[in-house]
Amino acid sequence: MGQCLESVKWADEIIVVDSGSTDATVEICKRYTDRITVTDWPGFGPQKNRALAMATGDWVLSIDADEEVTPGLAQEIREVLQAPLAQGYTLTRLSSYCGRFMRHSGWWPDPVLRLFQRGAGSFTPARVHERVELEGSVGALQQTLLHHSFRSLDQVLQKVNHYSHEGALALHAQGRRASLATAIGHGLWSFIRTYLLQRGFLDGREGFILAVSNAEGTYYRYLKLMYLQDKAPRA
């Protein structure tokens, strides 16, 4: 968290919304801002909209705790906001996986809309895979937003469980249904897409590990959905 906040300390205001962390996150945040709100966890989209509602500046830069604005990107943002030509801008995100920055596997290039005029955009209410809905034109910045997404295998396993849970809840809310066969099929397809079609094999061993963890996450998402649709114990 400190690495993230250090990279944006040049901002006019820093707003942090914490969903009840039990480590030193809040204490770290206090070194950079007093605009800290501790609340429940309604999902990624609703949580980011809570933070957005607290903003007072003309422009909003939304980043997650595991992301870092590079000095080059910070300079590019400051320059473009002197005379903006669009209502929002995508950032070029480069993500790491267990110590390797991934240039394939469907992770690159990864443009994400994170810089936008306050009042012109908001986040979709999705629990996972939220995105900004913007009224107006979108430009593109060239410098890099670093995403330290998975620092270790332990974190991979934790996030597989978390995201599969959130994904299952989202699918269940949409009325989607699943079976063991669909869970297996979606998981297998996820591996094929990541490792072969998106050339994950060019990312070395981390490309293979990512393809397997993607398959696991997809498999468990639909498996959890299967049990959500019928919580009664099975013989």
Residue spans for each PLM region:
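Short, well-formed alpha-helical segments that are part of the catalytic scaffolds
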Residues: 1-10
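Acidic helix N-cap motif at the loop->helix transition within catalytic regions
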Residues: 2, 23-32, 72-73
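A conserved acidic beta->alpha catalytic loop
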Residues: 7, 18-27, 64
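Alpha/beta-hydrolase active-site loop signature
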Residues: 21, 42-43, 67
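Conserved donor nucleotide-binding strand/loop of the catalytic core
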Residues: 26-54
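Cofactor-binding loops of NAD(P)H-dependent oxidoreductases
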Residues: 39, 63-65
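Catalytic-site signature of metal-activated, phosphate-bearing donor transferases
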Residues: 46-53, 58-59, 63, 70-235
